[in-house]
């Protein structure tokens, strides 16, 4: 009996011990599971919330895109970027306009492509006359067709204008009627008419065609560019004197063409060139940051005053000049209205007109990324697009340096942005044309720079760090100036475009 009691006692102790062990193991298991969960949660936070984006940030994506363009791998990418950027460069008050469903505000952009392509066609004509041995292989590298002769001007106009008229008629208003679809069991479902969907798809295809016009290598016969010929001596003399010092008069003389015998439309296009050339020559520069700036800033005596205190000359004049000289009746785009009683339709019309004007200028800017191009001595090696790539590459370098110093990602981004403003200050932007006052003096710039970034929350110590780091990197901008100067100097000795002044000495020659 005693033995049984002892055995029972031992069994009970073992059972209690086993339960105790199991309890401890269970607690350890629960503790391990909790720790593992917390660890995984923290890892997730590091990945999802605290991870620096690295190669996925905006600057990196832009840099890689520009780098592809620089390497001739995907040149049309810039065109896509610009077309998407038309919305972003609209003036701030127009950004908040609520456009009703079905209203198309893009049909003016199609017209902008026509104006730009005509200027490009005239420039191609000048190239074929002045540079008969010009290597057309550049076009093929850019995905453009080679030059296969001179197109008839009136045929070119008829093709453009008939397509444009059809586009406006078809796509001015994109209706989206709701029709009941009996095949759906849910009686609340309404579908747009199938024909309307096809029509809208057709409009998109026509828009794609217009966007391709500016990349088409077409030369045009200027004597057939129009039908009617009207001789008004005062007007003709004014236009002739206006082109006297430009490359267009050399082109007419080389072709043995009398200006007064040209069709009216050809006279308009020719008169358009020196005015645009004059504006560019007087200080407007195709520099790195124009797409990021407000395009309708208030005018000052020397140009327009941007919000950051910089002066950009004659930018707004480009838009006014295009509106003044354009042959298109803009009444449809920008009708007269009472400024004290502006309706939504008025605002939509203004929005359409602004998008048109911005597109005309933007398409001219795109042409500067081709070689040959109106505007001239640019881009044999895509030097303008190289500036974009270099800027974003430098920003990434600065960002990596700053990230090691600051744990707060967003604060580090501000320090990096402040640093690159200092680093890029010596870059002189534009060597193609004479240019006036471009920016503040360095000391005035530093005063403005410190005030701005203090307002954004940077401390004096961090501003001093950003200034020192930026000034250490200013040598890169100076080297870029030397490289660009050498490129322009070599190019101006052999290339003679339509946009140039006779006896003009650019900075490469001076």
Swiss-Prot record:
Membrane topology category: Single-pass membrane protein
Cellular component GO terms, alphabetical: host cell membrane; membrane
Keyword Signal: yes
Result for mutant: residue 434 to N: In strain: Isolate variant XX
Chief location bin: host cell
Disulfide partners: none
Transmembrane segments: 28-48
Highest taxon of the lineage: Viruses
Keyword Cell cycle (UniProt): no
Subcellular location, record wording: Host membrane
Signal peptide: 1-19
This protein's UniProt keywords: Host membrane, Membrane, Signal, Transmembrane, Transmembrane helix
Protein name (Swiss-Prot/TrEMBL): Uncharacterized protein 510
């Amino acid at each position: 009996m005693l033995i049984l009691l002892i055995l029972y006692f031992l069994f009970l102790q073992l059972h209690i011990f086993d339960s105790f062990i199991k309890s401890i193991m269970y607690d350890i298991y629960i503790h391990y599971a909790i720790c593992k969960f917390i660890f995984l949660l923290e890892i997730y936070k590091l990945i999802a919330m605290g991870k620096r984006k690295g190669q996925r940030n905006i600057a990196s994506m832009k840099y890689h895109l520009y780098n592809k363009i620089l390497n001739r791998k995907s040149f049309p990418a810039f065109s896509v970027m610009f077309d998407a950027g038309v919305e972003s460069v609209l003036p701030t008050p127009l950004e908040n306009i609520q456009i009703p469903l079905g209203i198309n505000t893009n049909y003016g952009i199609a017209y902008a492509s026509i104006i730009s392509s005509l200027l490009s066609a005239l420039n191609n004509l000048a190239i074929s006359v002045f540079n008969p041995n010009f290597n057309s292989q550049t076009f093929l590298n850019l995905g453009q067709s080679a030059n296969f002769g001179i197109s008839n001007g009136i045929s070119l106009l008829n093709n453009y204008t008939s397509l444009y008229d059809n586009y406006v008629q078809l796509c001015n208003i994109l209706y989206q009627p709701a029709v009941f679809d009996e095949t759906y069991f849910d009686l609340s479902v309404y579908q747009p008419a199938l024909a309307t969907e096809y029509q809208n798809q057709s409009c998109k295809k026509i828009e794609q065609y217009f966007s391709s016009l500016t990349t088409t290598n077409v030369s045009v016969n200027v004597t057939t560019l129009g039908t009617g010929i009207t001789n008004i001596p005062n007007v003709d003399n004014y236009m002739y004197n206006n082109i006297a010092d430009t490359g267009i008069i050399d082109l007419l003389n080389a072709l043995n063409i009398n200006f007064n015998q040209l069709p009216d439309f050809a006279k308009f296009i020719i008169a358009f060139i020196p005015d645009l050339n004059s504006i560019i020559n007087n200080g407007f520069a195709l520099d790195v940051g124009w797409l990021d700036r407000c395009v309708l800033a208030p005018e000052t005596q020397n140009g327009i005053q941007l919000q950051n205190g910089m002066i950009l000359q004659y930018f707004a004049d480009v838009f006014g000049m295009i509106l003044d000289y354009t042959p298109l009746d803009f009444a449809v785009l920008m009708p007269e209205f009472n400024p004290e009683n502006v309706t939504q339709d008025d605002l939509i019309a203004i929005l359409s007109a602004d998008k048109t004007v911005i597109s005309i200028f933007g398409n001219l800017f795109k042409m500067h990324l081709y070689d040959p191009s109106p505007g001239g001595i640019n881009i044999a090696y895509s030097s303008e697009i190289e500036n974009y790539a270099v800027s974003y590459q430098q920003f990434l370098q600065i960002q990596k340096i700053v990230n090691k110093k600051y744990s707060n990602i967003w604060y580090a981004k501000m320090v990096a942005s402040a640093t690159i403003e200092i680093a890029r200050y010596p870059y002189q932007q534009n060597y193609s044309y004479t240019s006036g006052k471009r920016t503040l003096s360095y000391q005035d710039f530093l005063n403005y720079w410190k005030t701005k970034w203090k307002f954004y929350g940077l401390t004096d110590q961090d501003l001093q760090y950003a200034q020192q780091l930026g000034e250490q990197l200013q040598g890169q901008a100076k080297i870029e100036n030397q490289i660009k100067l050498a490129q322009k100097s070599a190019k101006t000795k052999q290339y003679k475009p339509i946009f140039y002044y006779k006896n003009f000495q650019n900075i490469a020659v001076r």
